[in-house]
């Protein structure tokens, strides 16, 4: 089987003929978010379940001893990442956050000091086309805790602006392509009409006299 990476770099071999229709020179990039994020967050059954506080567990290194898992969990948090799962739904999350432990920060994303024996975590990401925030805590010994997903209004507005701009640019390029295609079609009709007139007069251009000799 051909290597997928090689396939990704392959370019179709197209030869453009005299009257071949011009190809579109743009690709619509898949958007990161859906058009109405808040509505989906409030109506989607999965989001409705995950928006309620429920049990979460650390899921990393399950085959290792509890002592080693505790160490790896704390080290991962200090590096700014961890793995967690909502027990009731089985939804697994790869959480990434700012692990800065500056005591003067008022809104830490990873806070070992807020409550003894626990780490409080906030992580921002896009899930199923919706900007959300994980908020919860995990016990440093048991490696379980409580968490939920919240709708991230600020980042949703930012991503929505990007989406609108992306759609506007796509529509503009689509209009430009349609104009080019229309101009090509009009030129093709003019050329074909010129050919028909040349044939009706007994030849095409200068070459007509050659055929009459």
UniProtKB/Swiss-Prot annotation:
What this chain does, per the entry, is described as: Regulates the DNA-binding properties of Runt.
Keywords attached to this Swiss-Prot or TrEMBL record, sorted alphabetically, are: Nucleus
UniProt organism field: Drosophila melanogaster (Fruit fly)
Return the protein name.
Protein big brother
Is the keyword Nucleus assigned to this protein?
A: yes
Answer yes or no on keyword Hydrolase.
no
Give the range the annotation lists for the signal sequence: none
Q: Which GO terms describe its cellular component?
A: core-binding factor complex; nucleus
Instruction: Supply one GO BP term.
Output: regulation of hemocyte proliferation
Task: Tell me the protein family, please.
Answer: Belongs to the CBF-beta family.
Q: What is its main location?
A: nucleus
The subcellular location is: Nucleus
GO terms, molecular function: transcription coactivator activity
